[in-house]
Amino acid sequence: MSASTNRRRLKDINTGAGENPSSGKKPLRSVTPLPISSKNSNPALQKSLSSKENPNPKLSHRSFGSTQKPVLRPVPRIDKSAVSGEGRVTRSTSSGLRGRSSSPSDLIRVFSDLRKRNESRVIGEKGESGQDKKSGLKSSGFKQGTSEIKVEPSSVCEKADEGSSCPVNSSKFEGSSVARNSISDPKAHALVGSGEKSTVALKSDSKIEKTGKGTSVALRRKSLDNVGKAMEMSKDIRGNEGSSNSTAKYPSKLHEKLAFLEGKVKKIASDIKKTKDMLDLNNPDSSKVIISDIHQKITGIEKSMSHVIDGPEKNKTTKAKSSVKGLNKEELEDRLLPHQRLLRSRTQSKTSSHVSKGHDSVESNKAVNAEEKPSAPVEENAIALEFLASLDKEKVTFMSDQNALENLEVQEMDTEEPSKENDVSKDVNLTSNLTEILRANEALEEIDDEENREEMELEEIDDGCMYQLNDIGSKTSTGGWFVSEGEAVILAHDDGSCSYYDVANSEFMVNECNSLSIWVRLYEVTGVFGFVHYVKSVYSPPDGISPNTWRDCWVVRAPGADGCSGRYVVAASAGNTLESGFCSWDFYTKDIKALHIEDGSSRVSRTALAPLPNNTSHGRNTPACAVVPETQQWWYRPCGPLIASTGSFQSIVKVFDIRDGEQIMKWGVQNPVSALDYSSPLQWRNRGKLVIAETEAISVWDVNSLHPEAQHTISSSGRKISAFHINNTDAEVGGGVRQRVSSLDAEGNDGVFCTSDSINILDFRNPSGIGAKIPKLGVNAQCVSSRGDSVFLGCTNQKSTVKKQMASSSQVQQFSIRKQRLVSTYSLPDSNSHPHHSAITQVWGNSNFVMATSGMGLFVFDTAKEETLQQQPLTSDYGSVQTVREIIGPNDMYCPSFDYSGCRVLLISRDRPALWRYLL
């Protein structure tokens, strides 16, 4: 036929085609051509018709006769760039026909391009006549937008009389086949593509046609039946798609369950890994040491059970032995490592639950697996299959250890029963194994008894260690106090250096690092227990300093040269020394900031001083702080950036700057400074006021005043001052007994001083300076401290009367400022030592404890409660008598002092290292 005839017919068809009723939607792509008659023998025409898209639905009603020539449909334009770049055909946004090509050459070029790129190739396989043939559609160039089964809601046409086509897009129709040339078969639903994408077009006349390379197959059904079946099929596919697209991913339920099991296995593996990491983090070296000890203890069990594996049932007895040994180890772990045992049990329970679920699912699907095998490869589920195969192979059950025979049995699937001879040998082996197991249990019981005894001993040791005195360092300490809320200690040493120890952190490190084992080994070697302390800072002594120069030390806060707050360590003389002076270090850099040595201090005779520092034995056997009368003493007291200095029997008071050692001011007092035995005559009321104890008066000086004169002078009525204490509201915070006093506690109670017949409460608001005067009878005051309403007086009883047995030679008396009388007496045990050795050198008390120290040790009392004071009758001289609660430290201490903060007590003796312990 001529080209003009073809153009005319195509034009007529285009003019009569009309608009597509579904022009508002983007047409679904279909590679299935219009059905053509099998009588048509023109291969070129068949090829051209197989490449068309958007066929005219009205031509589906036209009957094809033998004399009728085939009709060419208009070919849509194809975007070559899209074909070459992405393998997709650019489709029209309208379902209507856009017309034919501009020329036959364009049509030929389109066909050649499609042929070259294999963009829509339909392969059909021919078989023998009379047999069914398998067919598939291969679309390598045209890719679907999705890889799952998709059936559009508009894919089935419900109105058959309109004659519109209803395409159905489908992909991955696996596991099914279509019988070709069987028109009457109503069960042919889809085309098998072997995992590749295919397209099925369901039309109103129930024609499903598939065109191959030169062959065509027509599957015909009745309209109503096919439309109903198509709708049912679309609903089924949509339902399967809503349930996680399991049909698209897995060809059968077995594959779906295997994939589910694989996910469970991976989750279990990840949980095990996380648990292992957690155990590694919670398994320090100490746990390894404990585990190694357990391993050594069960070595005897392993040796006794080693010959079990030599029998004919080697594998079974080995597994049983491991279970028995593991059972014993679990018992040990339950007692020694409960946290690790808990984590392991939780992990095993999760694993067993997942395994049981997976095994049940496999057994339920054995019949399906035997009859039906998946068409797709299952290499991706190899882990799950291997895991399930191992479960099907054998099932091992371990019974309780009540019956040893059951504990040695291993149940295997699909195995033959053993012979009678094997049964006889098995009974013999089981009998011997049972004997060994019983012996192992006896050995374990002995081990448990030994460990229980060790635990009881360790508990006793732990309790004793809590209340044991512990040395701090190895240097002899001449003074020291708690700082930083009792967590650290500042010490002054006999060599002129100072050290800063972090007591709290040192004991924590020991407790965390196998403290019990360290204490046990230390006890085996030395016979004593103790804490290991680590010095944080050491402040080196200045050059040329004499031994035993420092007897007191502080940590002081003061603004630096740059205006920022700084910290300084200050050490100074206190009482009798060969040399007198002070030294300050920067707390952080440890550099010496100031050093001052008194010029005339070296002229003091040695005979008036304490024993030489190197003669330790002499110092322990002599009276505590034996002071020769009328011996000059030097005292230093800091407050903020200033430190005051004076000497007994002198009338000069100097003030220095601790940051550079420069002298700030110099005063002259009216009376010489008093020589006190156990109290400093130089004390601060706050940063602006300095209080000095003179021989017959108390003077108050203002360091901020331009006129060097006393602001207030309080007379002692001609009596000698024996003890002196001032409440400092600007003292350092975080300390112990020398911690600053609150303004509320110091209101009306600026301090206290004692004379031979009375206790005088200082109140600088009164013109006389004395707020209250409490008489004291028959005692010689040695030291005093004040806190709130209470005044604690350390004294020696010199009264010898019939009531002498009611009071010891040394005692602590508690007075009430509000009641202005004696409320309680705390008696120290009687001693035959020298009076100076048994004299109380320091006293302090609060609402819980009353403490007093002498050469006999530190004596701790429970503070008398208000209820107790009301119930007990008061004697005229001593009030309620309280007995000592406990004595801390040795009885040969030299010039002792103490400090208390929180739950720790610090004890200083100037002939040995500092001591501390808990006090609860």
From Swiss-Prot:
Principal place of residence: cytoplasm
Annotated region (Disordered), positions in chain: 1-199, 309-375
Ranges of compositional bias, category Low complexity: 90-105
Cellular component GO terms held in the UniProt record: cytoplasm
Coiled coil (residue ranges): 435-463
Compartments where found: Cytoplasm
Record's compositionally biased regions (Polar residues): 35-54, 137-147, 166-184, 345-355
Ranges of biased composition (kind: Basic residues): 1-10
Superkingdom of origin: Eukaryota
Keywords tagged on the record: Cell cycle, Cell division, Coiled coil, Cytoplasm
Presence of keyword Ribosomal protein: no
Keyword hit for Cell division: yes
Compositionally biased intervals (Basic and acidic residues): 112-135, 327-337, 357-374
GO BP term, pick one: cell division
Free-text function comment from the UniProt entry: Might be involved in division plane determination.
Subunit structure comment from the entry: Interacts with KIN14B, CDKA-1, CKS1 and CKS2.
Designated name of the protein: KIN14B-interacting protein At4g14310
Source organism of this protein record: Arabidopsis thaliana
